[in-house]
Amino acid sequence: MKFIIEALKRVRERRPLVHNITNFVVMNTTANALLALGASPVMAHAEEELEEMIRLADAVVINIGTLDSGWRRSMVKATEIANELGKPIVLDPVGAGATKFRTRVSLEILSRGVDVLKGNFGEISALLGEEGKTRGVDSLEYGEEEAKKLTMNAAREFNTTVAVTGAVDYVSDGRRTFAVYNGHELLGRVTGTGCMVAALTGAFVAVTEPLKATTSALVTFGIAAEKAYEEAKYPGSFHVKLYDWLYRINENVIRTYAKVREVEL
């Protein structure tokens, strides 16, 4: 828990600039989430300015939600540039497994090297070649033990930190694995909440190593969701309260409400 508190403190002190190449559906949502937490967002995907923008950024988040051939070129190029410049990269392979194009582009980006891969059970399964576990951008049902094993297997296969999100979130770098129990089911009734997590992971990975960064993002967001639900029981007001609690969350709140533990297979 101490590393989560320290990571949040660093984000607010350093206000990292997070370069998001993300989808049209969530640009506003994720930018506001980053601002509420204390980071600085930029949403830019033009291929012509990628190198300049990435030089300015502290981390890069790639989200394939509204993918097309132009976005693919920008995303692959951004991954290559960020790696050359030593900037951490978060990949959110939205809808991988739903279409061959999404799966292929996600694997193409992964092959260049990313620091964090965050997706639901179906998306991560698809990237490992397991089909039939995705419906659109949503994951079909699975067991917690399956999710834990999938997270560790994917981390080892892709040599990166992997988060598999769900009722329980699992994070692994192939050696250590954390389970995060924070969150609320109403998140599933608001579009873009998974994309928010990817963006926040970008803020955290700018200030600490990937395993701690990803775990910190999931715990922070999960607590914010729980606290938001205490004050707003319906999706519209809940969405607004999420921003409020990303802004309000602090050391005392994390110490009181964090539900995270290291697990073994």
From Swiss-Prot:
Protein name, entry field: Hydroxyethylthiazole kinase
One Gene Ontology term from the biological process aspect of the record: thiamine biosynthetic process
Assigned EC number: 2.7.1.50
Catalytic activity, as annotated: 5-(2-hydroxyethyl)-4-methylthiazole + ATP = 4-methyl-5-(2-phosphooxyethyl)-thiazole + ADP + H(+)
Function: Catalyzes the phosphorylation of the hydroxyl group of 4-methyl-5-beta-hydroxyethylthiazole (THZ).
Organism expressing this protein natively: Pyrococcus horikoshii (strain ATCC 700860 / DSM 12428 / JCM 9974 / NBRC 100139 / OT-3)
Keywords on record: ATP-binding, Kinase, Magnesium, Metal-binding, Nucleotide-binding, Thiamine biosynthesis, Transferase
Residues reported to bind ATP: 118, 165
HAMAP family named among the record's database cross-references: Thz_kinase (MF_00228)
Pfam families xrefs: HK (PF02110)
Gene3D superfamilies referenced in this protein's UniProt entry, alphabetically: 3.40.1190.20
Top-rank taxon: Archaea
Gene name of this polypeptide: thiM
Keyword DNA-binding annotated: no
Residue numbers binding substrate: 43, 192
Record lineage: Archaea, Methanobacteriati, Methanobacteriota, Thermococci, Thermococcales
